[in-house]
């Protein structure tokens, strides 16, 4: 009877505890009625929310420039300042996890739990954090199990240990006490010491099993396979089953324009053999190598074309000079013929001049002799007349 009288004020206190928490809840529900339209109290122009974090809710055109909603550190029964902060529906938490966006400031983790190319994040650390969190959670739940340590053989016979454990854990999370906890406290006074010792040993083994099940449900197992997640795996390129879809290159590319020599040279396919090097980045893509090879071949072909153009230009100049030399030779030969002809004519003129000079000299001598004879005859006639 004494135990039943002691339990009645405890039940009254437990029943009055939820009633004491009711007035703040009513005050929180009544505060939004003071300012029905919080957008009318905004002193900022209508600015749409930032586009980098997509929200599943359609953005309000009268959105507040601040990016955060009601702070989670505030008590749920308090009256949040609706004049300053907008409702949580407008600027909700981003729907994507940190690091999912390629241009996010967070690092992106690889699917196998290893760091990316930057090498800053691993899932092993998060797994360790989860194990620490679960261990602390187990420590917090241990007083609840110890409070149930006085249960007698009733739990061992009926098998209600796990059921009551789930009910008490749910009740502790909700801040209330269930009926099963009360029945456990009532039955605790009726258990014997021997049964309580056996029950404590059973709960210790159950706690270890519960910890193992909880760790297995969270994906953290103490097996040695966990060490494989911390090993850095090389990023390798998977070889394709079919041919590489990149363009095939040729060493004599562009030469088929001048000569059909493309069929004599083998074609190069852009396949890269995957090499497993720890901590190395992926090798260059085949199309990048093909592009470099194409650029190299184009540069070589342009050099060949420029050399060929220079040879053709020099050959054309040589041919032109040869033609001009032939023309000049023909002109020289014609000039030589003309000079020889003129020399012959000069010789003929000289011979004619000499013959004419001879003829003129003979005629002058004859005339001189004839005149002398005439003078002699006149002088003889004059002498004869004088003598007579």
Swiss-Prot record:
GO terms for cellular component: nucleus. Residues 1-49, 103-249, 261-316, 348-388 are annotated as: Disordered. It comes from the Eukaryota. GO terms for molecular function: DNA-binding transcription factor activity; sequence-specific DNA binding; transcription cis-regulatory region binding. Pfam families: bZIP_1, MFMR, MFMR_assoc. Residues 169-179, 214-231 have a biased composition (Polar residues). Residues 293-356 form the bZIP domain. Residues 302-316, 359-369, 375-388 have a biased composition (Basic and acidic residues). Residues 23-33, 117-129, 180-193 have a biased composition (Low complexity). The keyword Nucleus applies. Residues 321-356 are annotated as: Leucine-zipper. Residues 295-314 are annotated as: Basic motif. One of its GO terms (biological process) is regulation of DNA-templated transcription. It is found in: Nucleus. Highly expressed in roots and at lower levels in stems and leaves. Its main location: nucleus. Induction: Induced during incompatible interaction with the fungal pathogen Puccinia striiformis. Induced by abscisic acid (ABA), ethylene, cold stress, salt stress and wounding. Probable transcription factor that may be involved in responses to fungal pathogen infection and abiotic stresses. Belongs to the bZIP family. This is bZIP transcription factor 1-D. It comes from Triticum aestivum (Wheat).
